[in-house]
Amino acid sequence: MTKLTRFSVAPLHAMTRRLADVASGRVAPEFVITGARVLSTYSERILPNRELWITGGRVAAVKPAGAHKALGGGFAIYDAADGIIAPGLVDPHIHIESSMVTACAYAEAALLNGTTTIFCDSHEIGNVMDVAGVEAMLEDARQAPLSIFLTVPSTVPATSAALETAGGDLTPDKIADLFDRWPEAVALGEKMDFVPVCMGDERSHAILAAALQRGRPVSGHVYGREFVAAYAASGVTDTHEAIDRDIADDLLDAGVWIFLRGGPPTTPWHSLPQAIRTITELGASHKRTAVCTDDRDADDLMLFGLDWVVREAVKAGMSPEQAWSMGSLHGATRFAMDGEIGGLGGGRRADLVLLDDGLKPQSTWYGGELVVENGKITPRLDQALSQRYQYPKAAYATVKLPAQVKLTPELPTKACTVNAIKTALPGITLIHDKVAIAPASDWPTLFARHGLCFVAVIERHGKSAGNVAHGLLKDFGLTRGAVASSVGHDSHNIIVAGTNEADMQVAVAAIGSHQGGVCVVADGKVRAMVPLPIAGLLSDKRITEVAEEVKLLKTEWAAAGCTIPYMGFNLIPLSVIPEIRITDKGLVLVPQMELTPLFE
């Protein structure tokens, strides 16, 4: 049996004569899907009484129902029973690593949810393993039963060596080389350092040039209306951070695509309803908007895929036809691939989804092959998922912790001010809270009064002699033990929070023993652990197994009292999002891009 990958379907230029013969009825198709309503993303209508003629993994034509009868026989027929046939979903902005699984494992959940193409920014593994990590994920993607394209990581590290230690450093020359050697590298990934871009930083603009010289589009990530004009003038043409009405207005009129990000209500990515209202209240066209998932853990990916985002868009006021187009054709159009994916026109890949009236996927075809039927993966897909890429040995040895170091700071006995990191739902923006401490030696009482707990970040790439930075979280809610993660965005050093030194040490040791992971510790015991041995970011298990591990982690996370989800906790070191962060170098004041002491 041949492997099921993106390459299973021949390129269009090699099939045009065959497709023309089938479309005109001179040659029979390989199979026909009949009795369907077809969702046209081109006209944004649902067309009744249609059938699709498929050959070579591509759509030859959409015909009136029953047209195949004039051909005689010799082809398979699939009866859609008046269900809706729509093009497979296209996710224009995701990070596979957030799901903590490999590209091949990710494909299972994506196809179950009707997603057949993704545009992945692999800056997480790039921050750990540099080019070698990005290329390993590309090799993984080539073997996956899913169309995966790379938006080349543009901001590795997220800031500078003065503010944090990363494992990777993707220079302009390295980025140019990735574009030149990998056809899958179709765009530049989100340019998160929008302040340096707008200020004319030389390195940032050299990276932009590496993409623009090659005709590749540039993806973005920007906060603040004051930056929009300079950002757009620098060549950035999409962003997924536009939920405020005024900045969305500015971005649309500056020619910047807006990806409306949808996430479960319990995560930092729950912004879709507000984002949709922004577009509808502006009276703006949705033609330059698409929907995306951005980040999903393994558990949420199974339940809240891009199909869920589309349905949420309908709830927020879009028509079903508009919403599905935003989830398919628009993402394809943004990356100039609408001649291949995103619709059911002749010549397009036969990436198809059978929907019920609520836009819930029932069955999925990938390149004309049935991979999900009645909500279950087929033997063909199961076989493809078992042929997983083997990551190099170096990927299993990226957590290089120093000898035991102190994880809590020396607490002053004199009056001081604490530069605390105040957490709040959904967990993206962190507030710089200056907490005045009167002279006292009873710190446990002060911790309870002010809602404080310890936090530390430990350098794990073996580069900075085991840097450890200490901080205090406010309102994180942790009432016992410790929590730790090797997925501390974006440099992915170890972040640990706790109520006491002993449990914090146990948590960090557990991360080290598994070469990465996320864990909860109480009373000296590991209560939940998601091992992530590949680059300290990815599991080597099937997504269903990882999803079960994540469910237990979430249960124990909540039992520990944490007020923001673990994915929000992973963002605490992300030094490009306001207001205050902690990295292995110390506390970072983001607007000023400078370090500040814990106690003043």
Swiss-Prot record:
Highest rank taxon of the organism: Bacteria
One example GO MF annotation: adenine deaminase activity
SUPFAM superfamilies: Composite domain of metallo-dependent hydrolases (SSF51338), Metallo-dependent hydrolases (SSF51556)
Keyword Hydrolase: yes
Catalytic activity: adenine + H2O + H(+) = hypoxanthine + NH4(+)
Classification via Pfam families: Adenine_deam_C, Amidohydro_1
Enzyme Commission numbers on file: 3.5.4.2
Keywords attached to this entry: Hydrolase, Manganese
Keyword Signal: no
Cofactor(s) needed: Mn(2+)
Matching InterPro entries: Adenine_deam, Adenine_deam_C, Amidohydro-rel, Metal-dep_hydrolase_composite, Metal_Hydrolase
GO BP, sorted A to Z: adenine catabolic process
HAMAP family named in the record: Adenine_deamin
PANTHER family reported for this sequence: ADENINE DEAMINASE, N-ACETYLGLUCOSAMINE-6-PHOSPHATE DEACETYLASE
Membership in a protein family: Belongs to the metallo-dependent hydrolases superfamily. Adenine deaminase family.
Name of the protein in question: Adenine deaminase
Lineage: Bacteria, Pseudomonadati, Pseudomonadota, Alphaproteobacteria, Hyphomicrobiales
Originating gene: ade
